[in-house]
Amino acid sequence: MVGWSILGILLIVVATLLLARFVFNKQVEAYLCNSLKNEMVEKLKDAGKYVPDTTSYNFAYQKDSVQSQKIREYFKLDTVVYSTMPTWDKAISLARFVAENIPHANQKINPKRRNAVDLWKYTRSIEPAFNCRLHSILLHELLLSEGIVNRFVTCHPADSEDSDCHVVNLVWLPELQKWAMLDSDMNAWAEDEKGTPLSLAEMRERYIDGREIVYRPLLNSENDFVY
């Protein structure tokens, strides 16, 4: 009887695992992701808000018109963006162009040259995909070539023992006088409830305060959205 009881328990465990893996896979994944999200949000709340920045700097962005023209011609960006488009629409179009052509992967061979043209050539001759940092560098240069001020930012956790990170672009929107996060690697951007694009700092504040963040997918496929 004991043997049959153990066998019965094992069968139940196996059946449960199979159901979790093949039948309720999405539900289990959603539950685990939500649990992890709640845990991370609690850590953000414990960390508190950013200390007000009292330091200011005067600096100018260096412009390389020759390189910008080279990039625009190489990528035929006149077919991707138009001069009459608002800054944010241009930025989304460029991010969508990158996301459609280069998926995410942790490359096995690191490219020797990290500029827009050489990164593109890398995906056509060595590996077809690469990580978030290289995504951000490529998008950074495409945006700059169209006169769009932007930065690529490495997001680190506060935990010194956690080596994970993610790299995204911050785009300056002169029409709105604000920064906005754009992520061609994970194929998304973030908005508030009114449709205004959010910066990284604004996203952090909203997580802490419990306010809504609406994530928008860059591509049209249901499977491209991984936030």
Q: Residue locations for each model-derived region?
A:
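Intrinsically disordered, low-complexity, compositionally biased regions/tails
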Residues: 7, 12, 199, 214-216
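Residue-level marker of positions within ordered structural domains that often coincide
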Residues: 20, 99, 103, 174
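Hydrophobic/aromatic-rich core segments of domains that either
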Residues: 137-210
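Alpha-helical and coiled-coil interaction segments, frequently adjacent to or embedded
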Residues: 203-227
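Secondary-structure boundary elements
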Residues: 35-131
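Ser/Thr/Pro/Gly-rich low-complexity linker/stalk segments immediately outside membranes or between
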Residues: 22-42
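Long, hydrophobic/aromatic-enriched structural stretches that serve as scaffold segments
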Residues: 97-104, 134-138, 142, 146
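N-terminal Sec-pathway targeting helices
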Residues: 1-22
